[in-house]
Structures are given as structure tokens and as C-alpha cells.
Amino acid sequence: MKKGTLVIFRHGQTDFNKNHLMTGKLDVPLTAMGEEQAREAGRLIEGMSFDHAYSSTLSRAFNTAALALGQTTSNDHLKKADGTWHIVRDADIIEVDAGDFAGRNHKTDPEIVNFKRAFDRPVPGGESQKQAVERVGRFFENEVLPKLERGENVLVVCHAGIVRAFDFVLGTEKVPADGGGNPNKKRIPNATPTVYEYEDGKLVRFFQIDNQKEIDAANENKSTPVKKARPPKSGG
């Protein structure tokens, strides 16, 4: 039996998150708090050894992955000769395009507040959740699943909208039957790892890690409950 593990988490906090601004594909840096959140994510996955690491092409995701890996002692094999991390950047896991809403406050802007969301309805000038799911599905089928089937471990650091898209791709959320139902609006905390355990390419268990007790239990292959996520910073 081939056992592989996929770990996914969102990047750390940015100023756009802090100020409730829609981010989408805009490339904004981590705040000091976001950098510390990334390091904490690394401490949570300490003891896990990854064969492959991926991030989106945006700096907030890549830097979160690098800072997280820097807190681990079991992933030095992913370091390049110059000491930087071998993290593959993939455009298929870039944040959902916020289009005309990018840079605007999603709590107070009336156009955003009153926009009727649907799974297959894109925001003005941007993407729908359905479109994001399609490209995340392509990324998973081409880059991740073959590695899990070989019993390898994969780290993916991305964005809130992409974590939601992974829910559909991995089967932990159901795609609306008519394609036009409500989108996944699950709150996604910054830099909080979720572990997906696979056997022979099939998902058998998943859980979120938010304390050291859980990661210790995970490393011992013991079942642990999903912890309630801390409130996230919004916006991509």
C-alpha cells in the first residue's frame, strides 16, 4: 500500500487582509504578523518530510512556504545549493481573480456587498469559483495526484479562494449539481495547515492542525479531531 500525504495552507497575513481589501491576483507582501504566522505553520508541520513543495506565483504564498520550511528540520533535501528552497511556483494555484473588485473593501463597498455570488458567476472582470476549481483540478491531476499515488508527500501553499477550490477537487465539498448554486464561503484562516492522508491515491482522512499535540498524534498515525479554526484575515 502506498501512503502519501498532502498538506495545504493559505499564506500569512497581508496588509490587504488586515484592511479587508480584495486581493485576487495582486502581488502584495506579507506583514510582520504574516511572516510570523508562516513560521508558526512551519513549527506545526515540524517532523513532516516533503518530497515536493509548491506555491502560487505570488510572493505572499512563496514566501510563506519558504518561511514555513525554514522552521522544519526534516526538509533540508529541498534546499538548493545557494540555501534557498526548491519550491515550484504554479500559476494554476494563484488566487481567484478579483477583477474589478481588487483593492476594494469587501465589507463596506456597496457593489461588492450587494454582488449576488454563485458558483459559476464570475465577479466583474474576474473569475468564478467554478473557473478556479477547473484550474486547481488540473493542477491536482497533473502535479499532485501522481505523486500521492507513488506514496510521496506534497506541500502546497496558496490562497483562501484556492483552498476552497481544493475542497471541491478533493471531494470534501460537493460541487453544486446545476453549477449555479452557492459557492463555498468557508472561512479560511491564514497559515493553518490541513493534512490530507492518501492510500493508493485515495483520500482516507483529513484534519486541520492548529497545535503541537495534533501534529504529534498525526506523526504517530493516530486519529485526531478537526480543531475549530481561529478567525481568519479575509481577502485572498
Name each model-derived stretch.
Residues L6, E152-A160:
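Generic beta-sheet signal
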Residues Q13-T64, G125-G137:
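Loop-to-helix element that buttresses phosphate recognition and phosphoryl-transfer chemistry
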Residues I112-Q131:
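Short glycine/proline- and acidic residue-enriched helix-loop micro-motifs
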